[in-house]
Amino acid sequence: MYMWETEIQSFGDYLKIERGLSKHSHEAYLRDIQKLETYLAVSPVAIDQVNESHILAFLKDLHSLGIEASTQSRTLSGIRAFFQFLVFDGTLKSDPTVHVKNPQMGRKLPDTLSFDEITAILEQADLSSPEGVRNRAMLEFLYGAGLRVSELTGLKRDDIYEEQGFIKVRGKGDKERLVPAGRDAFKYLNLYLESVRPSVPVKKDATHLVFLNRRGSGLSRVMVFLICKDLAAKAGINKVISPHTFRHSFATHLIEGGADLRAVQEMLGHESILTTEIYTHLDRAYLTQMVQDFHPFSKLDKRL
């Protein structure tokens, strides 16, 4: 049951009866509203308590997930229509979206976590609980292999090649690639597979999947997002956190450590090197140090 079930039902009836929208458009509107509601469900917010800051924070999280600005704008449009309807029918006195601007086109880089912040988040997973073991294993692969959230939730048991130190993932366009994963990732994966997963009542359509929820079904992207957000909050991290943040941090730390850009491109599954260059944010201090260490003029200055 949704927190805003009554209001969503009324809006749905309005879309079908008053506006005569197609089933596809009707469902798209409701999905947009339910995304916002799911986001706010971490700390439940009543419909009449939603304000502009909630909407802005939600849009920022969509951005951190790598959602394109055009898709963010469409989602905001659905949410805006919902609140306008609630004002019109007297449920609300004001519309929290009235001053919210549509997301600007263009691509901004998501927040990057430091290694210490990554470690602090990983340590919040409670290894005394089944979900904690699973969550630790998932985050180890998000950061240790730079997986997209869809690649993590779609990871199959047959995709694990521990002896070779690789996993097989299916990226965009269902393209397969082999990605190296570290010892800690396999360590916590084995702990999950040996001590947790055997006790889960696995659904028939999920037997091939690695990571499951407590009911034995595959995990949703939203669930992984909420897990990341919850553990980051427990670690005292105030940045906008999502599964995408771990992937971005994976790439950033590799480049800062001296990894070849082409190798990072292959691990991330980017078709174009330009995507990797945009995706990989190098801080100014690192770039300055690179110039000081390797530029001929800098070396000349040291000899004078």
Predicted segments — roles?
Residues 1-304:
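Conserved catalytic core of the tyrosine transesterase superfamily
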